[in-house]
Amino acid sequence: MSKIVVNIEIQKDSNIKYEYDRKRGKIVVDRILRGDFRYPANYGYLEDALDWDGDELDVLVYSQEKFLPGTSLNARIVGAMKMIDDGETDTKLIAVHDDDYRLENIKALEDLDSKWLEEIKYFFSNYKNWKRPGITKVSGFENTSWALKEYQECKDLMREYGHLPKKEFISKMMKMHPEKYEI
């Protein structure tokens, strides 16, 4: 079990897609989701980890509460959702709010409601389909051990390449690690 501090970008049940802009150091509005799509979880990022899509590593925070964009909270990693977004690896760590006594019993993905896991899989498989069908692909869930390895790998990427502009990072990584991209 790993403790992390998650910076919240998007509140659970929001239809507004916010995104952290590392260059400006701010959370900005990216777009409004289409139709009745709403985020099924609080959505945040880890500022010390860079995912293969050139953005900070994403975290879905399981909680009964909604947290405002721009807030930080303590969480513990319980797994991950493997995802490809427009050809780029875009992993979502799954964590639970660590300061909520009601969630103390959740130590692994198996402790979460399977319907909630199906809901996040459906959401992330479909929320961009209006752009192009199949733009996002969710290949499944991984356990805590896998998630912690992915987090460490992304921390290493941030340390080595976090200074690069996003497009330059992706171009470099596509050559060095083609297995992380679907082109």
Swiss-Prot record:
Cellular localization per UniProt: Cytoplasm
PROSITE patterns in alphabetical order: PPASE (PS00387)
Keyword terms: Cytoplasm, Hydrolase, Magnesium, Metal-binding
Known EC number: 3.6.1.1
InterPro entries (UniProt xref): Pyrophosphatase, Pyrophosphatase_sf
Cofactor: Mg(2+)
Catalytic activity: diphosphate + H2O = 2 phosphate + H(+)
Amino acids binding Mg(2+) 1: D53, D58, D90
GO cellular component terms, A-Z: cytoplasm
Binding positions (substrate): K17, R31, Y43, Y127
Enzyme class: hydrolase
Pfam family, one: Pyrophosphatase
UniProt keyword annotation of Hydrolase present: yes
GO biological process: phosphate-containing compound metabolic process
The keyword Ion transport appears for this protein: no
Xref: PANTHER family: INORGANIC PYROPHOSPHATASE
Family according to the record: Belongs to the PPase family.
Entry protein name: Inorganic pyrophosphatase
Species the sequence originates in: Mycoplasmopsis pulmonis (strain UAB CTIP)
Gene encoding the protein: ppa
